[in-house]
UniProtKB/Swiss-Prot annotation:
Entry comment on modification after translation: Proteolytically cleaved by proteinase PRTN3 into antibacterial peptide LL-37. Proteolytically cleaved by cathepsin CTSG and neutrophil elastase ELANE.
Signal sequence segment: 1-30
Gene3D superfamilies according to UniProt: 3.10.450.10
Keyword Disulfide bond: yes
Protein task: Antimicrobial protein that is an integral component of the innate immune system. Binds to bacterial lipopolysaccharides (LPS). Acts via neutrophil N-formyl peptide receptors to enhance the release of CXCL2. Postsecretory processing generates multiple cathelicidin antimicrobial peptides with various lengths which act as a topical antimicrobial defense in sweat on skin. The unprocessed precursor form, cathelicidin antimicrobial peptide, inhibits the growth of Gram-negative E.coli and E.aerogenes with efficiencies comparable to that of the mature peptide LL-37 (in vitro).
Parts forming coiled coils: none
Keywords tagged on the record: Antibiotic, Antimicrobial, Cleavage on pair of basic residues, Disulfide bond, Immunity, Innate immunity, Secreted, Signal
Protein name: Cathelicidin antimicrobial peptide
Length: 170
């Protein structure tokens, strides 16, 4: 014979199981890192392995490529880091450090996983080639000069055409 107490007990256990069913997916979702969080973790790893005197901080993150939803699948990343004023031996977060004036800039590429529990990364960083930076400055300045010159040339052509039109005397 079933008692009223058994009915309450069954209802209570049903409620507990229902709540567990709702909470477990949230716990799984909470373990997935965002693209930027995964990159910041990779930078922490780069700083730990670095033999340089100062920490590096994220300078520029390339747009996130289209990815599948599996957090365990390695995702391609590329970003740029720059040397900060904080010594590597500090316990300070690189995000709290100012960039060092004329600090070393490194271009990093590789893969990260978004699974927080088993997060991993395979990143390699190379110094940004100063020649390419200088070449970029050259092209930027050339573009500015060409822009100014083209305006001047257009104005000269307009003036020339205005002088070609016969003037009528009134």
């Amino acid at each position: 014979m079933k008692t009223q107490r058994d009915g309450h007990s069954l209802g209570w256990w049903s409620l507990v199981l229902l709540l567990l069913g709702l909470v477990m997916p949230l716990a799984i979702i909470a373990q997935v890192l965002s693209y930027k969080e995964a990159v910041l973790r990779a930078i922490d790893g780069i700083n730990q392995r670095s033999s340089d005197a100062n920490l590096y901080r994220l300078l520029d993150l390339d747009p996130r490529p289209t990815m599948d939803g599996d957090p365990d699948t390695p995702k391609p990343v590329s970003f740029t880091v720059k040397e900060t004023v904080c010594p590597r031996t500090t316990q300070q977060s690189p995000e709290d450090c100012d960039f060092k004036k004329d600090g070393l800039v490194k271009r990093c590429m590789g893969t990260v996983t978004l699974n927080q529990a088993r997060g991993s990364f395979d990143i390699s960083c190379d110094k940004d080639n100063k020649r390419f930076a200088l070449l970029g400055d050259f092209f930027r300045k050339a573009k500015e000069k060409i822009g100014k010159e083209s305006k001047r040339i257009v104005q000269r052509i307009k003036d020339f055409l205005r002088n070609l039109v016969p003037r009528t005397e009134s």
